[in-house]
From Swiss-Prot:
It comes from Homo sapiens (Human). Residues 1-20, 116-136, 149-306, 320-639 are annotated as: Disordered. GO terms for biological process: DNA damage response, signal transduction by p53 class mediator; microtubule-based process. It holds the Pfam family GTSE1_N. Residues 181-195, 284-294, 330-342, 411-424 have a biased composition (Low complexity). The gene is GTSE1. The lineage of its organism: Eukaryota, Metazoa, Chordata, Craniata, Vertebrata. Phosphorylated in mitosis. This is G2 and S phase-expressed protein 1. Its main location: cytoplasm. The modification Phosphoserine is found at residues 91, 157, 171, 187, 208, 247, 262, 331, 480, 496, 499, 514, 520, 523, 528, 535, 555, 594, 611, 707, 717-718, 724, 734. Keywords: Cytoplasm, Cytoskeleton, Microtubule, Phosphoprotein. PANTHER family: DIFFERENTIAL DISPLAY AND ACTIVATED BY P53 DDA3 /G2 S PHASE EXPRESSED 1, G2 AND S PHASE-EXPRESSED PROTEIN 1. One of its GO terms (cellular component) is cytosol. Residues 360-372, 430-446, 455-470, 481-522 have a biased composition (Polar residues).
Amino acid sequence: MEGGGGRDEPSACRAGDVNMDDPKKEDILLLADEKFDFDLSLSSSSANEDDEVFFGPFGHKERCIAASLELNNPVPEQPPLPTSESPFAWSPLAGEKFVEVYKEAHLLALHIESSSRNQAAQAAKPEDPRSQGVERFIQESKLKINLFEKEKEMKKSPTSLKRETYYLSDSPLLGPPVGEPRLLASSPALPSSGAQARLTRAPGPPHSAHALPRESCTAHAASQAATQRKPGTKLLLPRAASVRGRSIPGAAEKPKKEIPASPSRTKIPAEKESHRDVLPDKPAPGAVNVPAAGSHLGQGKRAIPVPNKLGLKKTLLKAPGSTSNLARKSSSGPVWSGASSACTSPAVGKAKSSEFASIPANSSRPLSNISKSGRMGPAMLRPALPAGPVGASSWQAKRVDVSELAAEQLTAPPSASPTQPQTPEGGGQWLNSSCAWSESSQLNKTRSIRRRDSCLNSKTKVMPTPTNQFKIPKFSIGDSPDSSTPKLSRAQRPQSCTSVGRVTVHSTPVRRSSGPAPQSLLSAWRVSALPTPASRRCSGLPPMTPKTMPRAVGSPLCVPARRRSSEPRKNSAMRTEPTRESNRKTDSRLVDVSPDRGSPPSRVPQALNFSPEESDSTFSKSTATEVAREEAKPGGDAAPSEALLVDIKLEPLAVTPDAASQPLIDLPLIDFCDTPEAHVAVGSESRPLIDLMTNTPDMNKNVAKPSPVVGQLIDLSSPLIQLSPEADKENVDSPLLKF
């Protein structure tokens, strides 16, 4: 059998082994061993066993055999294998076959040895690096894991946690406590100056409540003047206010003594005069204490705290930047220090009052400073009047309007009037009265009364005032009594642009405050403190620049515009029709003023009618006649003066009488701009501002030539007006129009 022949090979090899050398014997043995080993895996019957075994791919068994051959272990294994195989029948090999088998055996043995050695070396090498690499990898991973664990331990460590917590807790906790003491320190400082008068109000629960808002106002002023106290004071204002209201009486005993006087002032003007004399002396030391840190800051706080209600409303309506600018400008260190010193010493106050009077004529900013003190005490207006007759007279006219409203509301103007002359006579008393105003709501009522007196006194002066623009504020006088305090607050923003408007608005809220003394007084106080300086500056400026004057005129008109509501708007539209040029030039200004008030159009036409820029001579004449009538009218009821003013303005608009009658009710702010179309027909209101501009030359014969320039101005202001073409209220509410 083949198998037998195959098995004869080892026998032949053995026979040859006897003749062969030892190495050959080893080779033969190796072959035999391998053959037998492979017989285990392969069938013994296959004749090509050797070929199959050795030429096939090397498996795990072959590698193991190669390793054993290298170790010379196959020698002992060989005898058992042949012994085990001995029972099989072996056929003898022929000589040729034996030689062939021998050669093949050697070749196979060499091949197997070489391959086995290479494989063994390769297997040994990769095993070592693999094991080493695995170990290294494990070590590295352990190190990395240890690092992570260490980091976790560091994070979890109580020290690290404590550090983090302390840092977080320290930054916020330390900040607020520091701010609180600052607020506390600031709160005593404030009550020492302006809160003393507030304490005088504190005896009554409503007065204490008002004192708190006033303190908030003072905090606003302090924040504007000094950024250090801004956040703390704003956040802690309610607490500080409550604490101040409680602790201030203990802190300032003098104001407590004044407390009984404060209600009496609010009730009786004569008592107010006596209290004014008393208050200036006490607030003066408070003011002196505050100026030590910053005279203008302390007194600025005084001025701010008085009008809480109106001041808050003003802050809402007016841009914070504008209010801050007003407060900063109005509360100039030197001027307020002078006021405080004047409070301390009436003689010095007199000298300084004369200085203030001279200042308004010279520059607008001193007027603004005076305006603060003047609002504090209308007497300032009177001393300022001789120094600057034009600005002072216009400003007085504004206050005259306010005073007329106050006279209508309050019956005590005569009693207040003597106090006013007394204050101007003694500059110190006047400054003291201003300080008292900043300190107490009583001063607010007195302010309204003084404004009435100043109105009575300044009415005569206003009548001679040549500038129609300043006379226009009388319109606002008529309107202000009817208009509600919120309307005044609305008008106050545009009045910021126009000093006269602001003055009238501030005065009107004071009169209204006479009804609800505490709230209105607080609001009036803030109003007088912040906006007045800007308005007085404007009053000083208008004579120098007529353009600013129409703005000032427009703002007072804005107050009556509210009262007139739709009717004044229509009237104003009729008036503005003939004067498109001036109207559009001032449209941007009017738009600025209008957003604050529901009926800005009436203000706009008035300001335009009185503005020197008007191209129509008829308008200037009509405005002069209207101003004269208005001067005569303000003595009477303010409302009739408004109606007359509207009628007078309609007369200059006689160029288009048909439209005048129709749009009185229908014309909104856009209609106001559309007044030329209104002349054509009431249905033309729907036309856009641009269409109106194009139509204006046709409608307004007098304005036809400058109409292109007016068109440009309207184009700039048209988008703001177009926001709410149908209703003026919408324009007022629109954010773009608001300042």
